[in-house]
């Protein structure tokens, strides 16, 4: 991965010296969370505005409040209207004469100006877009870029969206004589080493001889193929290294545009050789190997850091998921940041690239449905053109749980209550297709799929959609345009897929929706808890928590073990995308405010794994897993259910203070129904029901009678001191020169045992490190945020203090220096960054 990154830097550096100069435009912006006339004008006084660098999310800096119109589903954080301004100058001797600005993402309703001239508006908050600055650029004086961001029409999202210019911004300089437009390089490969490259270009109209020169480099920077000719070319790489899961071997394709033999512009892209196949009987194949898509759905926020892109936080997320055994990411439910796809390419993750959460029918008052008719073709085609060269992408999703699955009768007059009824209940036969004549909704599905195929015609990437209506009369399915059938939930219907969709490959595009709070356990653990019983019924519990045993889920969903069993034991199921990998801000099902973040994640909002993480790790990886839970701090004599996830062992035995509580083995059952699609069923944990007594509980794993591993949990005493552990140190390759560090904070007793019920308020401070130049200056690091995974914590994310939640919290710091943690009556702790 380092070699690949170094090669990309070399190539970009080379091009910046000659034909093209693309530079970050993130630094030196001014911002105000206000709105008044004249802010778009170049001479508007902005001297009192706040200085900041992008990416930026202003909502995460705000206070939680039930009065914020985003509601608990939107994270109960503020929206509003914000303005950004950036002053810059251009070298009057600049050789370039064409200037464009690219925004990777602005949420939402952005309007951009240059020197008082309006460049355009882009409503969709997840689209990448470009404007040509050339006609208005001032080469002899000050230039002012102004961006208005209007996220005041709330609610407009079913989850936390963030507010502002939350992704990167780029300034690109080229020559007007001839240039390659945005996303003008299209690269497609075959596993046999065939490469097809098409390069679009624009020219000034003068008489000139144009040609394209393509060069392919391997990961070591060696030229492995080259050609020169017309716009579309075919090349061959001999014995290519295949791109694979966990082995993201990347080639680089450099396309140079030549005028009369001189290079005037260049575009580069990574490329990978892999063979992707979906099969109706055997599921999914990569490079000829039959395997399961072990995926998760991910929203775009980074917990306490909000929606603003942070490459270190992004890489940390992927690293934690990879260690769990995840091999695929679904970008739920919108186009992802380009950096996520770059990382998935290099780390070897599969990707379902998703476009929309709604089409013409709205799910919330201010959502994208109001822009769909005018903007969907532009937004979808831009997504495909931007992302089509990424080898990690194996399928395109044109929508998630869109209400067009059901009848188009009164399509635009549904109330939100009616829409939610259809969305969550479904299965009303009267709203499904009743003839072979295609409905408006089926035709719309075909239209969207056609756009995908138009802009990605060379690579076999199927079109799918996340559908929570499993009936084959679903209007999306009736269209015939869905290449891979995707069910959201409904694992009970999976057995009928081969009958209902003959010849069609199948995946669970969204699954599970278990509800869990890290560190909280509801007993008896063999009881299944569902909440709410029906989606429209209010659910309240004084704890505002959900059980961390795998025994609590939403009414439309299942436990982790139940759905994994279906996926594992049915060959035709290509895999699943679990809802979700990480908790995310917003959508706090089953609760209302003060809950403000989700319970769905296998990993909490702070990035701390819940217990089910280890079930997947025991099934999806070759790591040795032995995970006993819960903690061992209870009332004397209290009946406690102890669970254990394990692998690579025949049996496990539990001991309390040295006394055996019995041996357990995971059970594999025979076929539930001999003739149906389900072949067998498996237990993925073992359990002991025991009486608590202070001391220690130990589990021992054996194979063939030989002890393999042991785990001991001791009864913790009173909180005594803090322990700081750097769990992730950022990489300069992904972030800036000041990497982001994540530090886990544990409250422990005098012997170092975690205090599982500790909720101490912990205060953080940072100090700088000595300057490397020897001038004696101090550079102070910054606390970016704090979190503890508690869904009802109303402490501001940007505060420098946080209560421990079940003994733990996390602090995020940017820069180098020392972090100090303090709490009343506890010994301090510090760690060097």
Identify the role of each PLM range.
Residues 198-201, 254-256, 642-646, 700, ...:
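Beta-strand-rich structural segments
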Residues 20-36, 47-91, 102-106, 142-207, ...:
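Non-catalytic, glycine-rich low-complexity segments
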Residues 42-45, 209-213, 246-251, 647-666, ...:
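Short flexible loop/turn segments that cap and initiate beta-strands
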Residues 138-140, 200-279, 688-695, 703, ...:
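Extended acidic/polar, glycine-enriched regions
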Residues 1-21:
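Bacterial Sec-dependent N-terminal signal peptides
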Residues 278, 621-641, 647-649, 708-742, ...:
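Short S/T/G/P-enriched beta-strand
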Residues 33, 51-67, 117, 168, ...:
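Extended substrate-binding grooves/exosites of carbohydrate-active enzymes
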Residues 21-25, 32-35, 79-181, 204, ...:
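Accessory beta-strand-rich segments of carbohydrate-active enzymes
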């Amino acid at each position: 991965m380092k070699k690949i990154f170094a090669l990309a830097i070399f190539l970009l550096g080379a091009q910046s010296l000659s034909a093209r100069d693309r530079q970050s435009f993130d630094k030196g912006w001014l911002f105000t969370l206000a709105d008044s006339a004249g802010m778009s004008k170049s001479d508007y006084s902005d001297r009192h505005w706040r200085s900041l660098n992008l990416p930026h999310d202003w909502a995460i800096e705000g206070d939680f409040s039930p009065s914020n119109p985003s509601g608990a589903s939107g994270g109960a954080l503020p929206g509003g209207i914000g303005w950004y301004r950036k002053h810059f100058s251009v070298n009057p001797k600049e050789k370039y004469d064409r200037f464009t600005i690219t925004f990777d993402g602005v949420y939402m309703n952005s309007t951009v100006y240059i020197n008082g001239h309006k460049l355009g508006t882009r409503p969709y908050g997840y689209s990448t877009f470009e404007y040509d600055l050339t006609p208005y650029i001032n080469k002899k004086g000050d230039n002012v870029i102004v961006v208005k961001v209007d996220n005041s029409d709330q609610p407009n999202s079913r989850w936390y969206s963030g507010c502002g210019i939350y992704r990167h911004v780029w300034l690109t300089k080229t020559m007007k004589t001839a240039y390659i437009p945005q996303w003008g390089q299209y690269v497609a490969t075959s596993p046999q080493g065939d490469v097809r490259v098409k390069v679009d270009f624009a020219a000034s109209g003068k008489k000139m001889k144009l040609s394209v020169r393509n060069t392919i480099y391997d990961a070591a920077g060696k030229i492995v193929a080259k050609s020169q000719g017309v716009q579309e070319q075919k090349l061959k790489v001999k014995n290519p290294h295949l791109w694979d899961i966990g082995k993201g071997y990347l080639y680089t394709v450099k396309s140079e545009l030549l005028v009369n033999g001189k290079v005037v512009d260049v575009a580069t892209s990574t490329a990978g050789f892999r063979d992707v196949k979906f099969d109706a009987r055997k599921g999914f194949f990569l490079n000829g190997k039959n395997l399961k898509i072990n995926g998760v759905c991910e929203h775009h926020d980074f917990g306490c850091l909000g929606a603003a892109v942070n490459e270190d936080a992004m890489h940390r997320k992927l690293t934690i998921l990879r260690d769990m055994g995840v091999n695929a990411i679904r970008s739920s439910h919108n186009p992802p940041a380009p950096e996520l796809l770059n990382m998935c390419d290099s780390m070897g993750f599969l990707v379902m690239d998703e476009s929309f959460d709604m089409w013409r029918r709205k799910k919330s008052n201010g959502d994208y449905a109001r822009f769909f008719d005018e903007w969907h073709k532009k937004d979808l085609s831009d997504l495909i053109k931007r992302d089509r060269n990424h080898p990690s992408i194996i399928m395109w999703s044109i929508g998630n749980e869109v209400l067009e699955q059901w009848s188009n009768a009164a399509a635009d007059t549904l109330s939100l209550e009616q829409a939610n009824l259809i969305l969550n209940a479904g299965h009303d036969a009267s709203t499904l297709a009743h003839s072979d004549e295609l409905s408006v909704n089926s035709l719309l599905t075909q239209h969207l799929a056609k756009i995908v195929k138009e802009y990605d015609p060379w690579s076999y990437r199927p079109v799918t959609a996340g559908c929570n209506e499993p009936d084959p009369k679903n209007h999306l399915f009736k269209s015939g345009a869905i290449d891979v059938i995707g069910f959201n939930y409904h694992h009970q219907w999976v057995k009928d897929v081969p009958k209902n969709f003959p010849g069609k490959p199948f995946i669970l595009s969204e699954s599970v929706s278990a509800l869990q709070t890290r560190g909280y356990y509801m007993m008896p653990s063999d009881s299944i808890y569902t909440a709410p019983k029906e989606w429209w019924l209010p659910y309240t519990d004084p704890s505002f928590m959900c059980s961390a045993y795998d025994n609590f889920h939403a009414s439309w969903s299942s436990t982790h073990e139940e759905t994994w069993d279906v996926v594992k034991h049915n060959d035709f199921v290509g895999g699943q995308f679990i809802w979700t990998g990480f908790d995310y801000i917003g959508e706090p099902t089953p609760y209302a405010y003060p809950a403000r973040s989700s319970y769905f994640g296998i990993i909490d909002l702070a990035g701390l794994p819940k217990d089910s993480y280890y079930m997947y790790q025991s099934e999806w990886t070759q790591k040795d897993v032995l995970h006993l839970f819960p903690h061992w701090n209870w009332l004397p004599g209290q009946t406690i259910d102890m669970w254990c996830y394990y692998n690579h062992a025949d049996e496990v035995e539990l001991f309390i203070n040295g006394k055996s509580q019995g041996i357990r083995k995971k059970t594999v059952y025979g076929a539930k129904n001999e003739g149906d699609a389900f072949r067998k069923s498996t237990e993925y944990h073992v359990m002991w029901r025991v009486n608590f007594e202070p001391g220690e509980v130990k589990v021992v794993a054996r194979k063939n009678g030989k002890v393999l591993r042991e785990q001991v949990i001791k009864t913790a005493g009173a909180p005594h001191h803090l322990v700081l552990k750097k769990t992730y140190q950022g990489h300069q390759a992904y972030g800036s020169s000041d990497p982001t560090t994540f530090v886990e904070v544990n409250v422990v007793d005098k012997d170092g045992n975690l205090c599982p019920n500790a909720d101490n308020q912990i205060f953080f401070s940072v100090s700088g490190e000595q300057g490397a130049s020897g001038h004696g200056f101090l550079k102070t690091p910054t606390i970016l945020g704090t979190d503890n995974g508690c869904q009802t914590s109303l402490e501001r994310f940007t505060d420098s203090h946080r209560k421990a939640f079940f003994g733990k919290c996390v602090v995020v710091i940017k820069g180098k220096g020392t972090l100090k943690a303090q709490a009343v009556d506890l010994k301090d702790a510090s760690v060097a960054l």
